[in-house]
Design a protein with these regions (language model features):
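Rossmann-fold cofactor-recognition segment
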Residues: 43-57
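Conserved NAD(P)H cofactor-binding loop of Rossmann-fold oxidoreductase domains
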Residues: 79-85
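Conserved glycine-rich Rossmann-like NAD(P)H-binding loop of the short-chain dehydrogenase/reductase
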Residues: 24-39
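N-terminal Rossmann NAD(P)H-binding glycine-rich loop of SDR-like oxidoreductase domains
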Residues: 10, 18
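Catalytic loop of short-chain dehydrogenase/reductase
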Residues: 125-151, 156-157, 161-164
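Substrate-binding pocket helix/loop in short-chain dehydrogenase/reductase
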Residues: 87-88, 95-97
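C-terminal helical subdomain
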Residues: 172-173, 188-226
């Protein structure tokens, strides 16, 4: 069984990922600022504590947990993300920076911390968005969010090249519309064709097997617009 670290687990896809991995017997460290929903699952395979991906102190807490409990990590799923749906001219520098702190800098720091704890067969899966894919349809109000999701696509390609001799593998999934609270914030009233649970099942399977077939690749996981 694998040691799986997942961020953004308080709701939506991250919550369903933690639940599914644990149900299948894997050890899960589920990280999010609000750990109450995950703890309410009362699953012995899930460890959780409040974690702010922008907090140095929380990273120190994470290092201590890994040292004392796991030692190694097999799968990292960078799922945590923050949305801002706001016209560009009304978006302040601070608001723009906040999105990048979570969606880019936090992802980079967590990945940097975990790479030395992962084997050649390990797999880092970063969750991006179709809005971050070059040439995809773009939507007003998502300048900060979609550009940050484009940044982690490029980071994934760079990491795969830099660590191609030693591993782990790095891949990025650009998701289309999934029925989550974040989708409702971005596109109020839109009904997505895919549920959070169904998407989580796909991501879990890819995280377990995808490194045998892909490295440094962007996979567009979408059947609708948006």
């Amino acid at each position: 069984m694998s040691n799986v670290l997942i961020t953004g687990c308080s709701r939506g896809i991250g919550y369903e990922l933690a639940r599914l991995f644990a149900q299948n017997g894997h050890k899960v460290l589920a990280l999010s600022r609000n750990d109450k929903p995950i703890k309410e699952l009362e699953n012995k395979n899930i460890s959780a504590f409040p974690f702010d991906i922008c907090s140095d102190k929380d990273f120190e807490k994470l290092e201590e947990f890994l040292k004392d409990n796991w030692g190694t990590v097999d799968i990292l799923i960078n799922n945590a993300g923050q949305l801002l749906n706001k016209p560009f001219l009304q978006t302040s520098r601070i608001e723009f920076e906040e999105i990048y702190k979570v969606n880019v800098f936090g992802v980079a720091e967590l990945t940097r911390l975990l790479i030395p704890k992962m084997s050649r067969r390990g797999h880092v899966v970063t969750i991006s968005s179709m809005g971050g894919v070059q040439g995809s349809m773009k939507f007003p109000g998502l300048s900060a969010y979609s550009s940050s999701k484009g940044a982690v696509i490029t980071l994934t390609e760079l990491w795969a090249e830099e660590f191609k001799e030693t591993g782990p593998a790095f891949n990025v999934l650009a998701l289309g519309a999934v029925q989550t609270e974040m989708l409702e914030e971005a596109f109020p009233g839109y009904k997505a064709p895919v549920s959070a649970e169904d998407m989580a099942a796909y991501i879990m399977d890819f995280a377990m097997k995808g490194q045998g077939y892909f490295n440094g690749k962007l996979l567009q996981v979408s059947i609708s617009t948006p």
